[in-house]
């Protein structure tokens, strides 16, 4: 199959490698020609995916229209904040569009497949999400993920396209739940990192993650998702790996906040985006819209955007009114 991948970061590059090794003709689009020139010379993406050799058959392209021309599938792997502008360039594209971007658009409250219905209305969107770090996928470490689409046939097509001996793809028709799980867990990962930065232990993080999955599910259901999706790979699975792994940008971002650094300065200095930072703002607005109680995410928002002291936020969570667990 002829495929274009939009976004030459870690995830786009790792998926490009995966799809080329699966026998597909793959073009990886990046917006900085000089970076692509480096990749052509070294057959590596040292900036975003260091230490990984890339197949020579992986085509690199800085011209967007050339990259997507005559393709049967486009994979979008760009930050959520530029997702609308980038996918608007797809125009009347009518093939499969697989989004691996995890975020919620602030102005509209839409997930990325929702944005696609506006920017590329003739395309068939599929969300691919789960507990995945690009470097582990690129090293062929066994990984499982979910392809979510309202169209069962589209999800199955993506399942067949991406599945390998080290990369197992499940399907779901709850695309909203799949995407919300992937987006909201990044906010919780920042909370987990703040806990680490404050020097708290395993008890604290276990309690945080367990209570957080409850509010992720509560908000997701209010938005129209299925509750069971949040205990699957794209919910609980992704939450666990992002909150506990040393690879997690969002957890690392939170750890720096917990140690006293300013969130905006951390974000400005990062090469790769910590999606939980903008998503905290979007999730807070979404929860207010649906009148859903999200105490953990509320405190993350207050720390990141209102300058609240992290230790005070933890005290406020612990001193909330006592209640049954379930």
Segments from the language model and where they lie:
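NAD(P)+-binding Rossmann beta1-loop-alpha1 motif at the extreme N-terminus of oxidoreductases
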Residues: 1-52, 59-62
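Rossmann-like NAD(P)(H) cofactor-binding subdomain of soluble oxidoreductases
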Residues: 54, 60-142, 158
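Internal alpha-helical scaffold of NAD(P)-dependent oxidoreductase catalytic cores
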Residues: 82, 115, 119-123, 142-229
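General beta-strand structural signal in soluble alpha/beta enzymes
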Residues: 99, 124-129, 169-173, 232, ...
